[in-house]
Amino acid sequence: MKVNNYPKLHNAAWPGVVGKGSPGAEPFIDLDTMLDHTAKAEVNGVKFDGFDLFLYDPHISIDATEDDLKRLADKASKRNLTIGSVVAPVWPPTGGGAALDEGEGRKNFLAQVEKGCEIAMTLREMGVRPYGIVRIDTACGPSDFLKDPIGNQRKIAETLWMACEIAEDFGEKLAAEGEICWGGMQSWITMVDLLERVDRPETLGFQADMAHTLLYLLGYNAPEHRLLPEGFDWKDEAAFDEAYMKLTDTLRPWTTDFHVAQNDGTVHGSGSHDKTGRHCQAKDPNGKLDIVKRAGYWLREGEGGMPHMRYRHICWDGCMFPNSVMNNPQTWNDILSTMIDVRNAHGWHE
């Protein structure tokens, strides 16, 4: 029997940047170090196939030149890694703007999307990026969004529709990562509503992160949309199955990019990053997710269905871990082992 070799297994480079580098936070971990950790991880002869990337300093500038991108491509190639999905820095502190702001915010948001799509296209043309999307969100918080939820959702949808036009010009696709900290995306209901309003399923999809979507079940920033009751008993597997199936059946048709992750049912913020679903280590005993089982709800056509094979790669996401954890080789071997288990259970062979 052939061993599954798809989806390809990627690590994320941005945990070296997210929640780090600001006053009171730990220092950044440079890109070379993150790529070395990724390339050196190995479990029974299996290694990571590639990495996903945040298009922002200190890893790679959103204003990178072609020579900068050639150097990036060389960094990947010499480690036998491909590049997959990339994150456009659409937020105000990184040169972007709020998608609900019809003025400068929208202009800056779209400018960063354009730069991100151009980089993604260039890396694709260089032959180091065979698949992947450009990751975005709404770059505004729930509190601002809730000042006028109906009007703001309309404005956000208009901004994202324009972003789709830009992406198509570069032959790229966008995916919005559902997190409780983004206005218009703070619950599974608002997320689907936004995707339906934009109505560009060939260009704008959903990026499902297992840690962040778990918080959708709990309704952390939208109690009216919670799928698990307050004080939920995590030992009640049947109730969790029912809620998780409802969530994934709703969002899976829109999902074009997938993050394997663990969460302990709490939120966490670090440095400049707002509170969002807490990423936990792959083998954290407090993790609420049976990662392999729950990944199947995203990677198959419903519970027990056939693998749908729509994601050419899947990526581990574990942000805001202490640097001591990040620089421990066992961390990455544990992560890779979990990713292999997911692929063996729900992948395919080509």
Name each region found by the language model.
Residues P15-I29, H59-A64, F145-G151, G219-D236, ...:
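Short, flexible/disordered intra-domain loops and linkers
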Residues N5-A12, D49-L53, I83-A88, G132-I136, ...:
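Hydrophobic faces of well-ordered beta-strands that scaffold small-molecule active sites
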Residues D36, D241-L247, P285-H308:
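A short, acidic, amphipathic alpha-helical segment used as a generic capping/interface helix at domain edges
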Residues G151, A157-G277:
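Acidic/histidine-rich catalytic cores of soluble enzymes
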Residues I119-P149, F170-C181, C315-W316:
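Active-site groove signature of glycoside hydrolases
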Residues D274-T276, C280-I291, C315-E350:
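Aromatic-rich peripheral "rim/lid" segments of glycoside hydrolase catalytic domains that contact
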Residues M1-P130, G151, W161, E168, ...:
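N-terminal pre-domain/capping segments
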Residues A25-D30, L53-D68, P92-A98, G141-L146, ...:
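Acidic-and-aromatic substrate-binding clefts and catalytic sites of carbohydrate-active enzymes
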